[in-house]
């Protein structure tokens, strides 16, 4: 008979994932052992393996959870408003997620090659879904640019994906202002960005 699940199973699993994101973000996946993860969680390696069959599964879970939050934000942003309003809402949601989950975002950007093929395929499929949403918005805003919407989409992500490294919630630039600036820059070029 299978052992019943502990009442705090989800809480413990989430704590392991938070520690994994923090350690993988700081030391890299290859530079972190399961013993390091267990120590950070103040638990045993065997308990880590109770929640995750392998170290690879912890990496996959960190990435999948972060991508699921991004997919949910994209889906929510697509519900109302014009294409430009949806792009602004999506950009703001993404920036908030990037800053609020710095470690997970860093892991997603830097550790993809460490996933086993099967898990990498799943993560890349989620990334492509998010890219497709933004590409659709750009195409809706500027249908005349249809032949180059994918490169424009990738430029857009190049502009916002690294904000987690420098944007601080307590800083002079709010996520809201930066999201608007990014969309203005994307849609109207540098001439549209104001200093105020």
Question: What residues fall within each predicted segment?
Answer:
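C-terminal peripheral helix-coil segments that are non-catalytic and often amphipathic
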Residues: 1, 96, 100, 131-140, ...
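Residues at secondary-structure transition points
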Residues: 3-11, 53-57, 61, 65, ...
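Basic, helix-initiating cap at the start of DNA-binding domains
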Residues: 1-27, 32-42, 56-60, 65
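Hydrophobic alpha-helical connector segments
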Residues: 61, 75-100, 153-156
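Short secondary-structure transition hinges
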Residues: 95-135, 165-167
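Amphipathic alpha-helical packing segments from all-alpha helical-bundle domains
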Residues: 65-71, 117-142, 150-154, 177-180, ...
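Short hydrophobic/aromatic patch on the recognition helix
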Residues: 41-52
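Helix-turn-helix/winged-helix DNA-binding modules
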Residues: 26-29, 50, 170
């Amino acid at each position: 008979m299978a052992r019943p699940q502990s009442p705090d199973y989800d809480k413990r699993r989430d704590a392991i994932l938070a520690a994994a994101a923090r350690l993988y973000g700081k030391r890299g996946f290859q530079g972190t052992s399961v013993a390091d993860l267990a120590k950070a969680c103040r638990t045993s390696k065997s308990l880590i393996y109770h929640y995750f069959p392998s170290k690879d599964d912890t990496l996959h879970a960190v990435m999948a959870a972060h991508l699921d939050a991004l997919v949910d934000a994209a889906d929510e942003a697509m519900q109302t408003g014009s294409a430009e309003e949806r792009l602004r809402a999506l950009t703001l949601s993404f920036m908030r997620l990037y800053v609020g989950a710095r470690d997970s975002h860093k892991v997603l950007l830097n550790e993809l090659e460490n996933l086993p093929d099967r898990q990498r395929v799943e993560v890349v499929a989620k990334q492509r879904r998010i890219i497709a949403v933004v590409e659709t918005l750009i195409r809706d805003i500027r249908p005349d640019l249809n032949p180059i919407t994918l490169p424009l989409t990738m430029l857009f992500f190049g502009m916002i994906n690294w904000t987690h490294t420098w944007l601080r919630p307590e800083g002079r630039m709010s996520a809201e202002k930066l999201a608007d600036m990014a969309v203005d820059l994307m849609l109207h070029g540098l001439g549209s960005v104001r200093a105020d």
